[in-house]
Swiss-Prot record:
Enzyme Commission numbers on file: 3.4.11.1, 3.4.11.10
Species for this entry: Klebsiella pneumoniae (strain 342)
Residues that coordinate or bind Mn(2+) 1: 275, 352, 354
Binding site for Mn(2+) 2: 270, 275, 293, 354
Keywords recorded for this protein, A-Z: Aminopeptidase, Cytoplasm, Hydrolase, Manganese, Metal-binding, Protease
BP GO annotations: proteolysis
UniProt subcellular location: Cytoplasm
Function: Presumably involved in the processing and regular turnover of intracellular proteins. Catalyzes the removal of unsubstituted N-terminal amino acids from various peptides.
Family in the record: Belongs to the peptidase M17 family.
PANTHER family named among the record's database cross-references: CYTOSOL AMINOPEPTIDASE (PTHR11963:SF23), LEUCINE AMINOPEPTIDASE-RELATED (PTHR11963)
Record-given protein name: Probable cytosol aminopeptidase
PROSITE patterns in the record: CYTOSOL_AP
Cited Pfam families: Peptidase_M17, Peptidase_M17_N
Cofactor(s) recorded in Swiss-Prot or TrEMBL: Mn(2+)
Length: 503
């Protein structure tokens, strides 16, 4: 699907369809008022007859409106004008895309980007429209033999901006939006792949392909079990012991900063391609969704794709910690004591608290890069789902400025995170009689004690932890990976690169 921006009058658009908003109760948006005036009150007459109230989600498709060059006008209900916020704006765009696709409009000029969204500029509105459009049209049908496609799918979308001065920022918004949307799609595709296909080797192959595509400044190295043993990554290795699939850590290095002294930002993704729970096996119900336990790695992969596509002037390293947690004769057990790469020892009380055992060794490994910051992304705890539900990602950090940056980026991207405390009081719950620490700290504050566990391996750099257990996928009828938090991390890196959308 193609996207572009232009600045023009609505009545002069020779398009299959133009899209304008209507507010509650039956109030025309400024652009719709222009069309109404030129059509001698045709649109307002329809509204007076009660054809459209302007409530969110309502639509009315008009054909051959007098004095208008476009074949059709799509009126979209936007709710009350003062209540149009970021979330409502994206829902309006989503409804627009679905309606255009369902009605066979292959191209359209969209004036919704001229609606007022409090505190958001045209760059934001165009970029969010692109990302939302791509999200709306996403489907995962690679493994289906019968693929259903619309008869006349939407192929071209033009977003109108108020003045020619804003064309440059609009074009930049489309460029950024497409790169982020492609990263989200890549993350969703990886997450939705079944575990018999998407194992650690598959993750490694995707990481290598990324380096092949962007060979100018992307290098991928894959570290296998033999090298992990030499490095002392015994905790990571223990988790994969019960699986026939080899544990593989894929390290993607992107160099975009011309300065020799520039330190990298490191992203670490938990990549449990299937988590049965191991010996502490999970209940059968819903276990199929444990293929999504690699969504942290999928998100890091998606972000690295975005960074390489936009050639951001940063150094960024993405680590995909691929592994599979299975029961078996070689599987690690409750009661085992593991010596981590850091030298600290961990008593295993539950083999289903495995993500932190993989991440702790990776967080030690990345010290060698002398990072500016490290952010790990993991479907880590069911406790985070209880705390924050399925809408907001949990954030913990040992560095206040980094935490504030991430929260700000999450708000701007519409991919929200909420900070949880890493208070010393919670550390006591990890005490063990037989090792330096236990791998679980009981039910109270489970998301926080998991963060506390990881914090013991991140003392040499600024670090943040994103627990995406509640936000990485949806269950039920809309089952599938969400691609979160690709948008959050993309915004964070765009901010770091100086692209704050204020041009």
């Amino acid at each position: 699907m193609e996207f572009s921006v232009k600045s023009g009058s609505p009545e002069k658009q020779r398009s299959a369809c133009i899209v304008v908003g209507v507010f509650e109760p039956r109030r025309l948006s400024p652009i719709a008022e222009q069309l109404d005036k030129i059509s001698d009150g045709y649109i307002s007459a329809l509204l007076r007859r009660g054809e459209l109230e302007g409530k969110p989600g309502q639509t009315l498709l008009l054909h051959h409106v007098p004095n208008i060059l476009s074949e059709r006008i799509l009126l979209i209900g936007c709710g009350k004008e003062r209540e149009l916020d970021e979330r409502q704006y994206k829902q309006v765009i989503q409804k627009t895309i679905n309606t255009l696709n369902d009605t066979g409009s292959m191209e359209a000029v969209c004036f919704l980007t001229e609606l007022h969204v409090k505190g958001r500029n045209n760059y934001w509105k165009v970029r969010q429209a692109v990302e939302t459009a791509k999200e709306t049209l996403y489907s995962f049908d690679q493994l289906k033999t019968n693929k259903s496609e619309p008869r006349r799918p939407l192929r071209k979308m033009v977003f109108n901006v108020p003045t020619r001065r804003e064309l440059t920022s609009g074009e930049r918004a489309i460029q950024h939006g497409l790169a982020i949307a492609a990263g989200i799609k890549a993350a969703k595709d990886l997450g939705n792949m079944p575990p018999n296909i998407c194992n650690a080797a598959y993750l490694a192959s995707q990481a290598r392909q990324l380096a092949d595509t962007y060979s100018k400044n992307v290098i991928t190295r894959v570290i296998g079990e033999q090298q992990m043993r030499e490095l002392g990554m015994n905790s990571y290795l223990a988790v994969g012991n019960g699986s026939q699939n080899e544990s593989l850590m894929s390290v993607i290095e992107y160099k975009g900063n011309p300065s020799e002294d520039a330190r990298p930002i490191v992203l670490v993704g938990k990549g449990l391609t299937f988590d049965s729970g191991g010996i502490s096996i999970k209940p059968a119900e819903g276990m199929d969704e444990m293929k999504y336990d690699m969504c942290g790695a999928a998100a890091v992969y998606g972000v690295m794709r975005m960074v390489a596509e936009l050639q951001l002037p940063l150094n960024v390293i993405g680590v995909l910690a691929g592994c599979e947690n299975m029961p078996g004769g070689r599987a690690y057990r409750p009661g085992d004591v593991l010596t981590t790469m850091s030298g600290q020892t961990v008593e295993v009380l539950n083999t289903d608290a495995e993500g932190r055992l993989v991440l702790c060794d990776v967080l030690t490994y990345v010290e060698r890069f002398e990072p500016e910051a490290v952010i790990d992304v993991a479907t880590l705890t069911g406790a985070c789902v209880i705390a924050l539900g399925h809408h907001i990602t949990g954030l913990m950090s040992n560095h206040n400025p980094l935490a504030h940056e991430l929260i700000g980026a999450s708000e701007l991207a519409g991919d929200r995170a909420w900070r949880l405390p890493l208070a010393d009081e919670f550390q006591d719950q990890l005490e063990s009689n037989f090792a330096d620490m236990a791998n679980i700290g009981g039910r109270p504050g489970g998301a926080i004690t998991a963060g506390c566990f990881l914090s013991r391996f991140t003392r040499k750099y600024n670090w943040a932890h994103l627990d995406i257990a509640g936000t990485a996928w949806r269950s039920g009828k809309a089952k599938g990976a969400t691609g979160r938090p690709v948008a959050l991390l993309s915004q964070f890196l765009l901010n770091r690169a100086g692209f704050n959308g204020e041009e």
